[in-house]
Amino acid sequence: MAIIKRGARNKTAQEPAKRSAKIKKATYDSGKKKEVGVSDLTLLSTISDEAINENLKKRFTNGTIYTYIGHVLISVNPFRDLGIYTDAVLESYKGKNRLEVPPHVFAIAESMYYNLKAYNENQCVIISGESGAGKTEAAKRIMQYIASASESNSESIGKIKDMVLATNPLLESFGCAKTLRNNNSSRHGKYLEIRFNNQFEPCAGNITNYLLEKQRVVSQIKEERNFHIFYQFTKGASENYRQTFGVQKPEQYIYTSAAGCTSVDTIDDVKDYEDTLKAMQVIGLSQDEQDQIFRMLSSILWVGNISFVENEEGNAQVRDTSVTDFVAYLLQIDSQVLMKALVERTMETSHGMRRGSVYHVPLNIVQATAVRDALAKAIYNNMFDWIVERVNISLQAYPGADKSIGILDIYGFEIFEHNSFEQICINYVNEKLQQIFIQLTLKSEQETYEREQIQWTPIKFFDNKIVCDLIESRRPPGIFAAMNDSVATAHADSDAADQAFSQRLNLFSTNPHFALRSNKFVIKHYAGDVTYDVNGITDKNKDQLQRDLVELIATSSNAFLRTIFPDNVDKDSKRRPPTAGDKIIKSANELVETLSKAQPSYIRTIKPNQTKSPNDYDDQQVLHQVKYLGLKENVRIRRAGFAYRQVFDKFVERFYLLSPSCSYAGDYTWQGETLEAVKLILKEASIPEKEYQVGVSQVFIKTPETLFALEHMRDKYWYNMAARIQRAWRRFLQRRIDSATRIQRAIREKKGGNKYEKLRDEGSKILAARKERRTMSLLGFRAFMGDYLLCNERKSRGAYIKKQAGISDKVVFSIKGEQLQSKFGRSSVRVKKVLILTHSHLYIIGQSMVQNSVQYTTEYKIDVNKIAGVSMTNLQDDWVAINLSNSTQPDPLLHTFFKTELVTQLKKLNGRIQVKIGTVIEYQKKPGKMHKVKSQVSEATPKYNDNYKSGTILVRRGHPANSPQKKKPKKGKGHSKHHSTSTSAPRSSVQSSQPSAPVSRKTKKPAPPPPGSKKLSSSVAQTASRPQPVANSARGAAQPQATPQPAQVTQPQQKKVAPPPPPPPPMQSSEPKYEAAYDFPGSGSPSELPLKKGEVVYITREEPSGWSLAKTLDGSREGWVPTNYVVKHQGGSVPPPPPAPAAVQATQAANVTSTPVSSSQSETATTATPASVAAAQPNFSDGLASALAARANKMRVESDGEDNGNDDDDDDDW
């Protein structure tokens, strides 16, 4: 199946939205033109002819001439250049559907070209409207767009496109003229087919010509002109032509000056003549062919200057024989033979099957003038037909045409003061086009809905078939048939034929669309009533050249003249030659048949005034056109109907890619009925049922937006498939790289050990068995990773802090901690800080709330080379003082869980640093003033933390100072085989226990938790998501955390085991109870706990920022609440908490790092309630992260409790 790629969309100047953004930021487009009225008449609130007219008037006044009725384009002639056909405008419509851009003729052309490629169906555009409404201009713009859109590097293709465009100036020159209503009125009809090859490049073309108005060659209405070419030639002819063909100015010729208009302000005849010559060259007309064309034009002009006078017998004779002599020279015939053919008529009698006598009948002046004009009309008409055929020969030079786009540019509906045979032919063709529009857009559409059993409310409309039958019908005879009968009855006498035709018109008196007047008749066309003159109408219908003129031309030595005239008519043939009426009926029906084989587009043109003024808008005239074009009915049917319909097979063939059930890898895989495939496609493409209906054999899409959505999804299918293949390949390559990395790491560790573990061992050496050790420090999983806040990553909290602090160097160590700060009139307090160490400086960064957001600023910037030493106690506390040398700043006293790693990193950067370990910490509280902080063993302190009180650090007894580091445990059996590995940050050999880079990784979906665990785990996630009041954390590594709750552990699917028995009910919490003083609905954040006034909760932690961590009495919900919204509960009956939920396996206990646990650990795990988990001694094999989380939360609860009751200021020396 061919892949159809729609043209690229134009990119805007703004940056693409982030992937996480749902809606792009709105921006003001100052260049966009303000919308006036509605761009689609189906959006009108009131559907009436007056409302349509008013909307068109608003847009015309604003310089907006295009409006839609669904897919039908309404065009109002602006009578001025609006600058809307430039190359830039044309480019903006490429690859766009009509809803993405304003209404324009380019949008219709783009739709046709896209449908040709997408559906491989012939396309055509029917441009209709009255004379002067802008049909020819619309046809030219469609050709301009298609030539530009069908880009090709082929020289032959480019030549065809140039030829197609060149047909415009050539056929305009020979087929258009200035009329009272239009300065460039088409006086013929043409249907141009642009044919395309399999690559949808224009490779051929064909033009069909319809009924040239040859009467204009010899006579025009006052202030009108002959065909443009006569004025171009007489004004712009070269000196060679003037000498050879005797070319004069247009004022010297009767055929160009009789109407009194030889120049038009808006027409440059000389320039247009040059364009015509260029077009002839592009199409391929040789110089000899061009010379012969201009010879014929000269002969026509000079034939018009032949005049007659009466001789003595009252017959006509040529006034000036020099004129006939020059005409004979141009036509290359004998002068005497020419004069005789003009003033005499040859008659031949017959007797049965035998020929009779031949008579030469002299003509009077009127008859001789008619013969002269007939000769001029015949030469021009036959030459025009030859030019069209010659163009077709050039356009057919390149074979391979498969599909086509047809452009119909035909004369518009005409109503003059005197209307004759030409007008009835023109108006008849317009009736046929109106009938096509009715058949395809109104009648056929409603019949299709009824046949397909689609829900539909019928709409009444006028079917003009009765008018078409009145003109073209043979049985019963129509007007053309009656005309032919009259000619056959009295073929020798035109007046008698007119009289016979007038009598036959009585046959139509009962037709409601016909009325008879004296010597005239009225046909009620769809565009209005037109009165036609009977006099002379039958003679124009004969369309036969007098026998004498045919024989005259046959004597010419000019090969071109003989070529453009057909062979002599067989005199013995008894068959009646076809009349002009027969030809126009045949041409019209062939046109209808051609159009019915293509998918039509419609352009309805409207003429706003009769004065050709760019500022006038004649409401009555436009309202009349709105009514006879049937725009109101079109709007009503469009609003009630469906924008697209297609038979099941073609719809499935087009869109089966959108359904995974019907396709795989681009192949059609559905084995069932096509009807079921249609329903699956629409369902799996998420098309609402109200947007389509499924009939008996077709599917109907209601709105064009839905169709465009389907087309867009289909266009994106191939790109999505390519992206999937690319993702799979990249995933494979990354897995291979990660595997190689793991192998390399394992080899390096085998040879030289892990660098992070080496750094840890070096830290143990620095302590030199002088400081008691914590349990967590001795774990085998412990490794000195350094950048725990991930400051070196691109998108992380640490990177944000680093940017705000103005740090540009690479970070070697980062952690959240606390600093002891003295407050005037208060005890020294522990203030949260961020510690960042680079190769040259140690940064102590503070944080503050500014407009509800955390801001980070550098408070201390310490040069590493100016650090003289560090001071620590010999107990297991986490305090360390940074002793500065010759500094005007006080020495900072810091608290951090990773104090040994900080000291090790400082010692590595500056080997001169002295590490002081004793019973006290000595530091400069003020510059030049030493202060000592004592340490004391207290078993009443929190198990995983220490307390600072009145210059003394209270801490439990730790492991002996000479305790050895435990060996790193082996990986568990349940470790994921294909876990993701990030190479962007350093990792230890056991990645599951250490903080890692913030790289999004997809892991296997964990096993579903037992009942009751979901609520508990969600509360932890909610609490951890709020940035302001959450305790210090480094992605869950060795930092204070909220009270741990059972949570899901991201681990491989393991074998199900029988659940343990439920635990006993939880003990009554000893935490203080508070009561909500006000309603707190919350802001919608999952980290907040909404409260109702009077609701009692536990407060587990208070923050200086004004937030408190609360949880409900039953422990099912936990979150942050404003501290000033709750007050101490004064007692009273509080309902007991409900029974504890079902037991949760220990492997699903709180684990903020989602550490995988080995299968052996999982099998020996025990159950625990949230309270018991917090208090339980962590098992070494449970991993560092779980133990750190439990330690941090327990420490925070106990530390806060003691600090709240401490009001003494023993440490204040201010």
UniProtKB/Swiss-Prot annotation:
InterPro entries: Fungal_myosin-I_SH3 (IPR035535), Kinesin_motor_dom_sf (IPR036961), Myosin_head_motor_dom-like (IPR001609), Myosin_TH1 (IPR010926), MYSc_Myo1 (IPR036072), P-loop_NTPase (IPR027417), SH3-like_dom_sf (IPR036028), SH3_domain (IPR001452). Residues 771-961 form the TH1 domain. The modification Phosphoserine is found at residue 357. Residues 1069-1131 form the SH3 domain. Residues 981-1000, 1037-1057, 1157-1177 have a biased composition (Low complexity). GO terms for biological process: actin cortical patch assembly; actin cortical patch localization; actin filament organization; endocytosis; mitotic cytokinesis. It holds the Pfam family SH3_1. Residues 36-715 form the Myosin motor domain. Residues 719-739, 740-765 form the IQ domain. Residues 1058-1067 have a biased composition (Pro residues). Its main location: cytoplasm. One of its GO terms (cellular component) is cell cortex of cell tip. It comes from the Eukaryota. Residues 1200-1214 have a biased composition (Acidic residues). Phosphorylation of the TEDS site (Ser-357) is required for the polarization of the actin cytoskeleton. Phosphorylation probably activates the myosin-I ATPase activity. Residues 965-980 have a biased composition (Basic residues). ATP binds at residues 129-136. Type-I myosin implicated in the organization of the actin cytoskeleton. Required for proper actin cytoskeleton polarization. At the cell cortex, assembles in patch-like structures together with proteins from the actin-polymerizing machinery and promotes actin assembly. Functions as actin nucleation-promoting factor (NPF) for the Arp2/3 complex. This is Myosin-1. It comes from Vanderwaltozyma polyspora (strain ATCC 22028 / DSM 70294 / BCRC 21397 / CBS 2163 / NBRC 10782 / NRRL Y-8283 / UCD 57-17) (Kluyveromyces polysporus).
